Regions:
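Paired acidic/hydrophobic, glycine-rich loop segments that form the ligand-binding mouth/hinge
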Residues: 80-85, 205-211
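Pocket-flanking alpha-helical
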Residues: 44, 62-102, 196-200, 218
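C-terminal segment of classical bacterial N-terminal signal peptides
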Residues: 14-23
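A conserved helix-loop-strand patch within extracytoplasmic ligand-binding domains
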Residues: 103-157
Length: 225
């Protein structure tokens, strides 16, 4: 018997230990989304061990990414488990799915409340303290040369499959960044995004783009003209 229970965290879920009476039932086969970033890979592997060793389940890790996994879980009920999910990527649709009983959040996670946005490195802000708003950054593409075309500013975005890839592409268009001298840097993967930051930090180079926690660049709430 396969446990047809869709488990989805509203932030990040670690450890599937809240099965209640289901834990004593025959477990059967379970699929777990193995998302394309490191912390999600780790959590998927830990959940696999817990389910196999603790509950006798047959567990398969399947490739996943935020939006494709959410869509598949919502529409097809597969995979069964997403041990890590960024809720703000699809918060309206997620809340609706939870309200309708299509998905369920189980327990609080050890990693919650992470911010995300546009960032620069500390050494950049120290040298250019005026760069604290999106407008100030976008006026200086010369400070952030694109790795493939130094005549343009490089704006690093999320890997394919992350909802923030779409939102950052939309921001790129909304801010008319191409006309301001910018071009998107395709990071390709979570490792590629991380590596671009690490490389810039090691070399003392400037870096601008999307990430989880560095030096936050505020974006005004006024409507764009």
């Amino acid at each position: 018997m396969k446990i047809k229970r869709i488990l989805l965290s509203l932030a990040v879920v670690f450890g599937l230990t809240s099965f209640g009476s289901v834990a004593n039932a025959a477990c059967g086969n379970i699929t777990i989304a193995n998302m394309n970033w490191a912390s999600a890979n780790f959590m998927a592997e830990v959940d696999k061990i817990i389910l196999e060793e603790g509950y006798g389940c047959s567990v398969e890790l399947v490739p996943g990414a935020t939006m494709p996994t959410f869509t598949s879980m919502q529409e097809k009920g597969e995979p069964d488990v997403a041990p890590e999910f960024w809720a703000n990527a699809a918060i309206v649709a997620l809340n609706k799915a939870v309200d309708e009983g299509k998905m369920h959040s189980i327990n609080k996670a050890p990693i919650t409340g992470l911010g995300e946005g546009w960032w620069v490195l500390p050494h950049t802000l120290k040298k250019h303290p005026e760069l604290t708003t999106a407008e100030a950054i976008l006026a200086r593409p010369d400070l952030f040369p694109h790795p493939e075309d130094p005549s343009k500013g490089g704006f690093h975005i999320c890997p394919p499959g992350w909802n923030c890839e779409l939102s950052n592409r939309n921001h790129f268009r909304a801010w008319d960044m191409e006309a301001k001298g910018w071009a998107i840097v395709e990071t390709g993967s979570a490792a590629g995004l991380d590596g671009s930051i690490a490389k810039a930090a090691e070399r003392g180079e400037n870096w601008f783009g999307y990430y989880l926690s560095l030096i936050h660049i505020s974006e005004p709430t006024r409507p764009l003209e």
